[in-house]
Amino acid sequence: MKILCVCGLGQGTSLILRINVENVLREMGIEADVENTDVSSASAEHPDYIITSNELAQSLEGHSSKIIIVNNYFDTNEIKTALEANLA
């Protein structure tokens, strides 16, 4: 499974999100290839899932990947809830 964590510039915030997603997936016992990028580059990628904010998700409407919305990239409980709801 490939997961792409997306923020506006693809550096700071998406890196934090990627680290938190990797930690939550590890706790859940799920293996995945998790990467981070900016919203423009994400349009050309084809992962299984894209995790991003509600605002940036609007820029990815029509994308072939399943979009998972996370509003607080630092909140591992929110990330876990979103992953459980979408990966099940």
Feature roles, as predicted:
Residues 37-41, 78:
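Short acidic active-site motifs
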Residues 45-46, 63-64:
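Short, structured coil segments at secondary-structure junctions
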Residues 66-88:
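Ser/Thr/Gly-rich flexible loops in soluble cytosolic domains mediating phosphotransfer, phosphorylation
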Residues 34-35, 47-53:
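Short, hydrophobic beta-strand segments that form beta-sheet elements in well-ordered domains
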Residues 39, 52-58:
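Short, polar loop motifs at secondary-structure junctions
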Residues 59-60, 77:
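Glycine/Thr-rich phosphate-binding loops of Rossmann-like dinucleotide-binding domains
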Residues 2-38:
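Conserved active-site segments centered on acidic
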Residues 1-2, 88:
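Absolute protein N-terminus
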